[in-house]
Regions:
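HEAT/HEAT-like alpha-solenoid repeats
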Residues: 8-22, 48-63, 90-104, 131-147, ...
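A generic tandem-repeat structural signature
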Residues: 10-11, 28-30, 36-44, 52
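Long, helix-rich interaction regions
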Residues: 156, 161, 313, 400, ...
Length: 485
């Protein structure tokens, strides 16, 4: 595993050692030998097939005679060897191995299931397997035996089946796979629905959605809406999957927006915090799509509802609402945004004291975007108030919060000019609290970076004349941060 392709010069010798293990009378030794070949083939891809020639025949014979776990290991070994072969040989071996794979689809053994899925992934990528063959011979059994509720409860198998479905879609096309996933999307079992949404999002992310006809689009959106409405777990995959499909459809989403937004607005007033959180998260993802569809009235309506929800008491939900508002600010014409920016910002300032990580990051990002896009709509006094709140966040134990606070501080300094901010920061260097002095020194460095060192240096050098150790140390720290930034 550590050597990877560096194993190639030693393959011949290793195969000489391993080949007798494939015909050993003890089952565990045959299994270990086959697993070793599978690992070596995987590591040496796409080279080294000549070294494996001596084990092909015993593997081939073993595949026809063995059953159970031994067969699973032999299948895994041959499955990893096929990608190393020339197209002609690969086609022949693929055709033969697929017969065994088809036969073993209904095996109850988990090891066999994993081996079958691995072989299917490898064979789908070879030229010998045609889309027609996969649609007619493989897909029906694959969906019948693997797309079942029990698979959704096994985390490892769940991921394998989802990934194999995405690989299969590259050969048979997105419409065929999505058509077969509509039933699991509507299933009563939530883990099964979640698994189906993960698969749909992988397929759409991989191949796009251009090939879907109008009827299939309607059925897909309907099924995703059902999955979203029925969700009771914390899995973010459902609304993210919905977002991937909506983003792929883009302007084709326009006919579906009204019912979707109606459901989101109902969910934002739901008694369950989890439902409200997921509704706000989906809202954040859909806002760029709403903008692309030209539904600006709908965007303003959403913005008003989100603004009215800022009194949310659950921090997880509040963080998602702030994220959605941030998305709305990015996608709107700020001169026409409702409610206006000068009404939104004073409402946000008290929320800066909330020390929940998700709230901190999202509120700072939202204020930073407003400071970058429309600073003139907010009074300088309000920006100064926000600057002092941000100073506290510069000493946050969370690195992501500190980084976002730094960027936002710089945006505000650019918006209102460095003079007022610098006066307040330089005064902070005289206080007794060390942490505040360090944060102020960092902030001075950020102001210098955002507005240019020439705006900050004269004031800093003037302040350095103050015969106070704290002030002088603070100025030196600020200079260090300025050079660092």
């Amino acid at each position: 595993l550590l050597l990877k392709r560096d194993i190639l010069p030693h393959l011949q010798g290793l195969m000489e050692c391993v080949k007798d293990g494939l015909t050993d009378e003890h089952t565990p030794i045959r299994t270990i030998a086959a697993n070793t070949i599978a690992t070596l083939a995987q590591m040496s891809y796409p080279y080294g097939i000549e070294s494996f020639n001596i084990v092909l025949e015993p593997l081939w014979r073993g595949m026809r005679t063995h059953r159970g776990k031994v067969l699973a290991s032999f299948l895994r070994a041959l499955g990893n060897l096929i990608p190393l072969m020339d197209a002609e040989y690969a086609g022949y071996y693929t055709e033969e191995i697929m017969r065994v794979v088809n036969r073993e689809f209904d095996s109850p053994d988990d090891e066999m299931k994993k081996a079958v899925l691995m072989v299917l992934q490898k064979c789908c990528k070879t030229e010998g397997v045609t889309p027609k063959y996969l649609r007619q011979e493989v897909a029906p059994n694959f969906f019948k035996y693997f797309w079942v509720r029990r698979t959704a409860l096994d985390r490892q198998l769940n991921k394998l089946v989802t990934y194999t479905t995405a690989i299969l879609s590259e050969k048979v096309g997105a419409p065929f796979i999505i058509e077969n996933l509509l039933t699991p999307l509507r299933d009563e079992a939530e883990p099964f629905r979640t698994m189906a949404v993960h698969a749909v999002s992988k397929v759409v992310a991989l191949l796009g959605i251009a090939d879907l006809d109008e009827r299939l689009e309607i059925r897909l959106i309907d099924a995703l809406l059902i999955a979203f409405q029925e969700q009771t777990n914390h899995d973010s995959g459902i609304f993210r999957g919905f977002g991937i499909v909506a983003t792929a459809l883009d302007k084709r989403m326009k006919p579906f927006l009204s019912p979707i937004i109606s459901i989101i607005l109902n969910h934002l007033k739901h008694k369950s915090p989890l439902v409200r959180e997921h509704a706000a998260d989906l809202c954040a993802i859909l806002i760029p799509v709403i903008k692309n569809c030209g539904e600006l009235e709908m965007l303003n309506k959403l913005s008003i509802i989100l603004y009215e929800s800022l009194g949310e008491v659950y921090p997880e939900v509040l963080g998602s609402i702030l994220s959605a508002m941030s998305s709305a600010v990015m996608c709107s014409n700020l001169s026409k945004l409702q409610p206006p920016i000068n009404q939104i910002v004073p409402t946000l300032t008290p929320i800066l004291r909330n020390r929940h990580r998700k709230v901190e990051i999202n509120i700072i990002e939202l204020i930073g975007r407003i400071a970058s896009l429309a600073p003139e709509y907010v009074a300088p006094k309000e920006w100064m108030r926000i600057c002092f709140e941000l100073l506290e966040l510069l000493k946050s134990p969370n690195k992501a919060t500190r980084r976002v606070a730094n960027e936002t501080f710089g945006s505000i300094a650019r918006a209102i000019g460095p003079q007022d901010v610098l006066v307040a920061l330089l005064n902070n260097l005289k206080v007794q609290e060390r942490q505040l002095r360090v944060c102020s020194a960092i902030a001075i460095g950020i102001v210098a970076k955002s507005c240019g060192p020439y705006t900050a240096l004269p004031a800093m050098m003037n302040e350095y004349k103050t015969p106070e150790t704290n002030v002088q140390n603070g100025i030196l720290k600020a200079l260090a941060f300025m050079f660092e930034y």
